[in-house]
C-alpha cells in the first residue's frame, strides 16, 4: 500500500507532478515524462508479484505508475544519470515505495555482466528508448535531453540484448518506438531471441497517421504476432478518448 512517508525534498528547478491518486513524481529539466511514457506504463502493467525492471527510467515515472496501479514484488529502475537517480530515490521515499523500487545507476550495456540483476530472473522489462539514431535529427545542446532522444549512450540492440539476458524464459519485454523504425526493431528482437507477440499503433486522431507503436516481445516465445486495435488519443471533437482517459485520466484530472 502506498502513502507518503516523507516531505518532498525539491532541488531548484524541480517540481512534483501527480501520476495517480496519492502518487507523485519529482521532475525537472530534461527528466520529465510525456504521453508516450504513460501509455507504455499502462501497456506494460505488471501482474501481482512479478519481478520487473525499467531500463532508462529517467525520473522513474514507469516504476511509480506500476507500484501505484499494480503490485509488483520488485522493480529495478535502471538509469545512467546521477541527477535522475536522485529524483527517483526521493520520489520512491515520498510515495512509500522504497521497499519495492531499487534505483540502479548503471549503463544498460554493462547491466548483464554487472550481476546487479540476476540473469534469467525477471518477469517483465519495460523501456522507453531513444527514438532517433545518433547523428540524425536536431541534436539537443542539453546532454540529458540528447541521451533521452538520440542513441548516443546505447542503441536498441543493446537494450534488446540486455532484456533477453535478464528475462526468464517466457518473460516479457515491452517498449515503445516511432513507426518508421518498426521493421528494424522487429529484426533486432528476433536476433536477440525475443519473439514479438503484441503490437499496437497510437494515433492522435482517426485521420492522422500513427505517431507511436507499443510492442511486447517474449523471450523464447512461439511465432505469432497479434496486431491490436489502434489506440486513439482524441475523438472527433478534440476531447480525449475514453480509453485515453482510462490510462491517463487521473493525471489529466489533476491538471484541469
Predicted regions, residues:
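Mobile active-site "lid"/loop adjacent to the S-adenosyl-L-methionine
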Residues: 129-158
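General small-molecule cofactor/ligand-binding pocket signal
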Residues: 26, 102-104, 197-200
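SAM-dependent Rossmann-like transferase core, predominantly class I methyltransferases
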Residues: 7-51, 57-69, 216
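Conserved SAM/SAH cofactor-binding pocket of Class I
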Residues: 43-138
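Residue-level signal for inorganic ion chemistry
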Residues: 40, 128, 159, 217
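SAM/dcSAM-binding transferase cores
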Residues: 209-256
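Glycine-rich, phosphate-binding/catalytic loops in enzymes
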Residues: 120, 141-144, 191-192
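Conserved Class I SAM-dependent methyltransferase catalytic core
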Residues: 33, 153-210
